[in-house]
Amino acid sequence: MPSIKLQSSDGEIFEVDVEIAKQSVTIKTMLEDLGMDDEGDDDPVPLPNVNAAILKKVIQWCTHHKDDPPPPEDDENKEKRTDDIPVWDQEFLKVDQGTLFELILAANYLDIKGLLDVTCKTVANMIKGKTPEEIRKTFNIKNDFTEEEEAQVRKENQWCEEK
């Protein structure tokens, strides 16, 4: 199987099977634009928004999911589920918050829908059922609202709380 070289933002080169790399719509488009559809090339494809540690994790995820069917298109009318993360992905995403957020940014930049979905669902599960104070604690967010501002926000968004 032909391979290509991907270069991380910190200069590390990764040799990857073309089909695995093409799970990224961004890379697939780059290869098509450069006329490198199926045959490898010696020049690395620069990925300035992804460092080596994160690119290594992205490649690991893509390799594991190489035979998966393409993820379905989002249906805006359909409620999104967050309880359907495969066990392998749950284990893979047991990382620190910084790494998880870097994976979200990389999946978004590289346009890898499946990875973006599971990383975002993981964050959604970290928030689900928590009070604003618990969410702030989980993500180390400082509350910079005054009591008056907080009361105003609660009043404006009261409809959200109605059951």
Curated annotation (Swiss-Prot):
The keyword Nuclease is annotated on this UniProt entry: no
Any Gene Ontology CC annotation: cytoplasm
UniProt keywords, alphabetically: Host-virus interaction, Isopeptide bond, Phosphoprotein, Ubl conjugation, Ubl conjugation pathway
Annotated Pfam families: Skp1, Skp1_POZ
PTM comment, free text: Undergoes autophagy-mediated degradation in the liver in a time-dependent manner.
GO biological process: chromatin remodeling; maintenance of protein location in nucleus; positive regulation of ubiquitin protein ligase activity; proteasome-mediated ubiquitin-dependent protein catabolic process; protein K48-linked ubiquitination; protein monoubiquitination; protein polyubiquitination; protein ubiquitination
GO MF entries: beta-catenin binding; cullin family protein binding; F-box domain binding; molecular function activator activity; protein domain specific binding; ubiquitin ligase complex scaffold activity; ubiquitin-like ligase-substrate adaptor activity
Top-level taxon of origin: Eukaryota
InterPro entries the record matches: SKP1 (IPR016897), SKP1-like (IPR001232), SKP1-like_dim_sf (IPR036296), SKP1/BTB/POZ_sf (IPR011333), Skp1_comp_dimer (IPR016072), Skp1_comp_POZ (IPR016073)
Annotated segments matching region Disordered: 63-83
Cross-link for Glycyl lysine isopeptide (Lys-Gly) (interchain with G-Cter in SUMO1), residue positions: 142
Region: Interaction with the F-box domain of F-box proteins, residue numbers: 104-163
Protein function: Essential component of the SCF (SKP1-CUL1-F-box protein) ubiquitin ligase complex, which mediates the ubiquitination of proteins involved in cell cycle progression, signal transduction and transcription. In the SCF complex, serves as an adapter that links the F-box protein to CUL1. The functional specificity of the SCF complex depends on the F-box protein as substrate recognition component. SCF(BTRC) and SCF(FBXW11) direct ubiquitination of CTNNB1 and participate in Wnt signaling. SCF(FBXW11) directs ubiquitination of phosphorylated NFKBIA.
Oligomeric and partner information: Interacts with KDM2B, forming heterodimers. The KDM2B-SKP1 heterodimeric complex interacts with the PCGF1-BCORL heterodimeric complex to form a homotetrameric polycomb repression complex 1 (PRC1.1). Component of multiple SCF (SKP1-CUL1-F-box) E3 ubiquitin-protein ligase complexes formed of CUL1, SKP1, RBX1 and a variable F-box domain-containing protein as substrate-specific subunit. Component of the SCF(FBXW11) complex containing FBXW11. Component of the SCF(SKP2) complex containing SKP2, in which it interacts directly with SKP1, SKP2 and RBX1. (Microbial infection) Interacts with vaccinia virus protein C9L.
Family from the record: Belongs to the SKP1 family.
Protein name in the entry: S-phase kinase-associated protein 1
